[in-house]
């Protein structure tokens, strides 16, 4: 993918604000400038950013319906009613179910959990699950990470004598389900100050409110924060505000005292003994938690997450790891087929957006394939498979473009849809696919902005190699946890040269190990450029080039700072 480098020289006002903040907090101007770009301009705001405190969490009772939800839960416990904790089959849903179930189980035993089967029941609340709940004399269902659009299903549940408390974060329609309580910060009438909680985050706020109402110490919620960190990373929600607090302390819990289930996953991932980051969750832990829901049933994942015996958890984690290996092979095959289809379509006509359909593709993997196609071709993408005459799948978007609105514009062709700005799930009749493709592509072509069609690499600062020190790297660590709205800072250095020892490495000679010299300071830095071996010939030509990179620690040489190079371009003459 070709990236457009996006760098804005700081204004005189920003320079002055940077200097003042750097003096106040005793930090380099480079780091102070990163804070200014994140809207942090005072010493107290910087302190809150670097050291988020759990006592800064928002009062959960500011969320609409929270008092009603807590009262109904207390009432259910008082009446000894059977309670079901129900959730989506992805990471966010499974961690949310595990969190709520584990916490409530400490105080109440007449409770069970339920994850719908992706292939048999589909997304959200199924009639099958409601019939099962009625057969088990369930009187209250707490649904997590789904349910905000389940109007017919919750009306049916009401006929069965089952009440619902919805804990969701997806965008609601104008009409809301007839649940007892709807906890969703994205409600149109929401007064909750932070709008970007994930499903597990909403579940945590519910348990925080329940604990507060019942005089349960907040400290009893802390062991569950590792679930929050995993869900925030995997669901790719903004790591700002309340999410930053939950992610910061959740990572701390994950590193210092993870739950038994999480500890077994960490071991299976080969991460034991390492300081875990949000990237480890996104690329290592999250895919394994997701794997059961993609190729088998998400109930296996919750079984693991609530397990108390480490040896049993390790056995379950090994099985889930096998599911992940199976998922990776399916993913590889489907991605190859998807790329072939796109190349064929592109040879005929440029596509403003991509819609792919293959009835043989596995339903649980289409979301991953949609993400890969979006990344490769940098266009809004929908990938669909088929089950019993109904096509279902996932839509993924590019930075800045709201794919939810694009899908919503075609709602008369759809059976169901729901999601966020950048990710939507949808289903429709197979015969509607051609018209959906036409209208979806037309809507995108009319609404996407030119700058949204280019992959941007947002550079935060231009620096010389002399500025890159171990202290700078250590101070940069304080900006973590990273994620949307708080990305890992990208730096740029211009007019660098190969120091003479750069070489192509890797099993397939796909990476470049670099030793570079900065023409302005004559300082030398080591770096690694993954998947960029095509640039090796230019690098060895003794001409200057510009690089964009993050500053990392060399995991093989502890204490040595190196550059992880994200892009390389010839210097402008």
Regions flagged by a language model, labelled:
Residues 119-121, 150, 170-175, 189-191, ...:
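Short gly/pro/ser/thr-enriched loop/turn and capping motifs at secondary-structure boundaries
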Residues 2, 10-140, 160-161, 211-438, ...:
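Hydrophobic helix-and-loop "lid/oligomerization" segment in the mid-to-C-terminal part
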Residues 150-151, 235:
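Intrinsically disordered, low-complexity regulatory tails of plant transcription factors
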Residues 139, 180, 546:
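Conserved acidic residues
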Residues 99, 175-216, 221-233:
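Short alpha-helices
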Residues 114, 144, 167-169, 183-185, ...:
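Generic beta-sheet signal
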Residues 75-81, 312-356, 409-573:
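Mid-to-C-terminal polyanion-binding domains and interfaces
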Residues 75, 171-184, 516-521:
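Acidic-glycine-rich active-site phosphate/pyrophosphate-binding loop
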């Amino acid at each position: 993918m070709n990236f457009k480098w996006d760098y804005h020289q700081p204004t005189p006002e920003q320079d002055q604000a940077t200097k003042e903040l750097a003096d106040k907090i005793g930090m380099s101007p480079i780091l102070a400038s990163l804070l200014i770009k994140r809207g942090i301009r005072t010493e107290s705001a910087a302190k809150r950013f670097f050291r988020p405190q759990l006592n800064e969490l928002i009062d959960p009772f500011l969320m609409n319906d929270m008092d009603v939800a807590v009262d109904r839960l207390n009432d259910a416990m008082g009446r000894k009613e059977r309670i079901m904790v129900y959730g989506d089959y992805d990471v966010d849903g499974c961690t949310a179910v595990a969190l709520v179930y584990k916490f409530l189980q400490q105080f109440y035993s007449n409770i069970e959990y339920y994850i719908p089967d992706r292939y048999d029941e589909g997304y959200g609340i199924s009639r099958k699950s409601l019939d099962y709940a009625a057969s088990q004399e369930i009187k209250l269902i707490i649904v997590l990470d789904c349910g905000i659009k389940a109007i017919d299903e919750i009306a049916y549940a009401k006929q069965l004598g089952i009440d619902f408390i919805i804990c969701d974060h997806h965008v609601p329609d104008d009409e809301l389900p007839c649940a007892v309580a709807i906890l969703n910060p994205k409600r149109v009438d929401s007064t909750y100050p932070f709008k970007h909680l994930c499903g597990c985050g909403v579940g945590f706020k519910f348990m925080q409110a329940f604990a507060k109402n019942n005089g349960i110490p907040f400290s009893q919620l802390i062991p569950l924060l590792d679930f929050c960190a995993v869900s925030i990373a995997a669901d790719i929600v903004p790591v700002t505000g309340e999410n930053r607090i939950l992610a910061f302390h959740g990572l701390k819990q994950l590193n210092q005292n993870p739950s038994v289930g999480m500890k077994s996953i960490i071991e299976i991932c080969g991460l034991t003994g390492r300081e875990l980051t949000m990237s480890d969750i996104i690329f290592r832990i999250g895919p394994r938690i997701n794997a059961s829901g993609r190729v088998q049933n998400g109930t296996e994942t919750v079984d693991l997450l609530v397990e108390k015996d480490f040896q049993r958890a390790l056995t379950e984690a090994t099985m889930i790891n096998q599911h992940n290996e199976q998922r990776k092979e399916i993913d590889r095959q489907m991605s190859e087929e998807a790329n072939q289809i796109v190349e064929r379509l592109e040879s005929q006509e440029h596509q403003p957006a991509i819609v792919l359909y293959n009835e043989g593709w596995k339903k649980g993997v289409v979301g991953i394939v949609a993400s890969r196609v979006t990344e490769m071709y940098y266009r809004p993408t929908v990938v669909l498979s088929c089950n019993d005459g109904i096509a279902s799948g996932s839509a993924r978007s590019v930075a800045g473009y709201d794919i939810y609105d694009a899908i919503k514009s075609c709602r008369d062709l759809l059976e169901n849809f729901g999601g966020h700005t950048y990710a939507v799930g949808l289903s429709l009749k197979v015969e509607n696919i051609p018209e959906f493709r036409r209208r979806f592509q037309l809507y995108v072509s009319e609404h996407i902005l030119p700058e949204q069609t280019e992959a941007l690499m947002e550079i935060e600062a231009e620096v010389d190699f002399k500025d890159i020190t171990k202290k700078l790297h250590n101070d940069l660590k304080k900006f973590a946890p990273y994620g949307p709205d708080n990305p890992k800072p990208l730096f740029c250095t211009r007019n660098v040269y190969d120091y003479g020892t750069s070489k192509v490495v890797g099993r397939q000679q796909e990476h470049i190990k670099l030793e570079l010299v900065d023409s302005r300071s004559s300082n030398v830095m080591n770096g690694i450029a993954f998947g960029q071996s095509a640039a090796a010939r230019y690098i060895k030509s003794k001409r200057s080039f510009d690089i964009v990179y993050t500053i990392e620690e060399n995991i093989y040489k502890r204490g040595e700072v190196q550059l992880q190079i994200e892009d390389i371009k010839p210097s402008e003459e």
